[in-house]
Amino acid sequence: MRSIIRMLCICLALCLAMPALGEEAQQSAAPIVRVWLRRLGLTDRADLTLDGVYTAQLPSGVEMSFPKGSQVTVLVRSGELYLFYEGMSLHAGTALQLIRNASESTESEGIRFVEGGNFYPGDLTLTLTDQGLLRPVCTLSVEDYLLGVVPYEMSNSFPLEALKAQAVCARTYALSHVRGDPYYDLEDTTNDQVFRGVNLTYGNAIQAVRDTAGVVGTYKGELASCYYSASNGGQTELVENVWSGRGDWSYYQMTDDPYDLENPESVVRRATLKKSGEDLPEAFLTLLAQQLAEQMTAKGFDPTFRGLRVDGISAMELHTPKYDAPSRMWSKLDITFTWSGRTVTYPPAATATPEALPLADAGDQEISLFAQGQATATPAPSAGASAQPTQTPTPTATPAPVYGEWESMGETTLTLDVFPQLVRALEISISGSDNEMLTLTETDSAFRLEARRFGHGVGMSQRGAQWMPAMYSKTY
């Protein structure tokens, strides 16, 4: 009886749902995007809090309406979906849609996957992947989508004008990268743009989205590809240097970005090489030894970093840009240094000899190893006798290698590959993409290499965009 009454109440709530006349209705003309909420990592269960009036629609045509605040659970059982709500269960088959009903409420309205967490302001479609896992896809206006993108692709604490620039880039990217996939248009990960739902406390990001509503970047009347990355290292990169494929990318140029360089929050990795040759990293010495291996072997030296000593570094120079001018992504480093080598010998290891076993006394019983059918009785232990374990020979330690005296080999100049050998050996690789912008400075006692660029470097630098309005009053 209670289940019947509850079902009647749900149906009544559906009948009373009315269209909205507020701001949400005004945004109805905004383009719609479908976002696969892959970052949530759902497998066979979704616990949902409906912060709004929602209607569940099943492929069979059955509909159920849920009042705001309802908590529902969707489970995968034997390859199909089941919806559970207040003791009731509903077989949903292979697809389930939760449609948000229009409302005049100015408060948050959407679906929360974590109680008290961010909300997703749109419809939710649940289907199954080929692996039988939940595929949650949120369908919402691009303007609402940006509310969950801008403060995560760029911090809400950034200047408002920087956030506006981010909103325009993110909006243009979303609309120009809509997939033709039957299930979704965008992912909520860095495969597209990070989307984590809406947090209404991020007022700066919300204002930036509202103030730039509908603004996109275009080229020749078409949506442009407005790329951005965390930091370009002081110079923007060309699209064709990062991604393959054809296209007219003439609106992207390789230009200097002093704002990214000036921003102290731009990522920088540093390595200091003393001119005295002291305290050089083992990996760097290994790199030099590999370059000198033939010469070291010919002299009988140990061709590893242990057989090499750098006595002094007199010159270093970065050169050979990876791409055409004006690129400053150097791919080679010349290093001039004096060095010494030494021989190594390995003494033969001693062989451990186990102690000889004692011979049997003449009076001991003779036992034939080949006797058949005779069982030997187990002797009773003597009073007070204890078992004596057989001693295992102690292993002999490997003798330490014996090195000869250092022999000076004079001065030499080597050309090292910056990518990937040098940046890995000096541990100045930032993102592992082998695209860092390196600079070299010299002091009285050392050479210092600095590596910059976090991301692909194409388009807007987020750190540069942060610095421009903060220090130079630039607008988006």
Q: What label would you give each PLM region?
A:
Residues 2-476:
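Conserved, single-site charged/polar hotspot
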